[in-house]
């Protein structure tokens, strides 16, 4: 176990709180005008999947569990869960749906990901920062509404909704940031 300050906690970290392991789902630092800055953390208990919210002062010490980040390749999904393979040892790991969370929408066959492993158990998935997806559906732009930089809603090939610039149409391949579903750029391929 390593002690770290609360403000350095990030999504995907594994924390030891009162002898139980938790995976961090979201971590936000708040700096109110008055009072001390705090870190708001939403976590999922590994043993039973219960979601918990904690709030710590940003300078408070929390224990981060030793977790090994291992590179895996996504193979396929079936009734058992999501199957990943370690490209160096060819070992396969099955990850359940609860561990995957909302990130499962971005998985593509053959995609390289990082799984956070603790004692042989997959705790969290770290996707690549950006993925390339196709726009399936988007609203047409009405002339005259482009005076300000406005974005329009679009549905991606994985079913996720994202906001894209007005010049992007259905069928266009775009690069999306996996962390917040935001548009990065038009795909160069």
Curated annotation (Swiss-Prot):
Q: What is this protein called?
A: Elongation factor P
InterPro entries, A to Z: Elong-fact-P_C, NA-bd_OB-fold, Rib_uL2_dom2, Transl_elong_fac_P/YeiP, Transl_elong_KOW-like, Transl_elong_P/YeiP_cen, Transl_elongation_fac_P, Translation_prot_SH3-like_sf
Question: What does the entry give for GO biological process?
Answer: peptide biosynthetic process
Q: Which UniProt keywords apply?
A: Cytoplasm, Elongation factor, Protein biosynthesis
Q: What does this protein do?
A: Involved in peptide bond synthesis. Stimulates efficient translation and peptide-bond synthesis on native or reconstituted 70S ribosomes in vitro. Probably functions indirectly by altering the affinity of the ribosome for aminoacyl-tRNA, thus increasing their reactivity as acceptors for peptidyl transferase.
GO MF entries:
translation elongation factor activity
Q: Which Pfam families match?
A: EFP, EFP_N, Elong-fact-P_C
> What domain of life does the native source organism fall in?
Bacteria
User: Could you tell me which pathway this protein works in?
Assistant: Protein biosynthesis; polypeptide chain elongation
Quote a single Gene Ontology cellular component term.
cytoplasm
Compartments, as annotated in UniProt = Cytoplasm
Q: Which family does it belong to?
A: Belongs to the elongation factor P family.
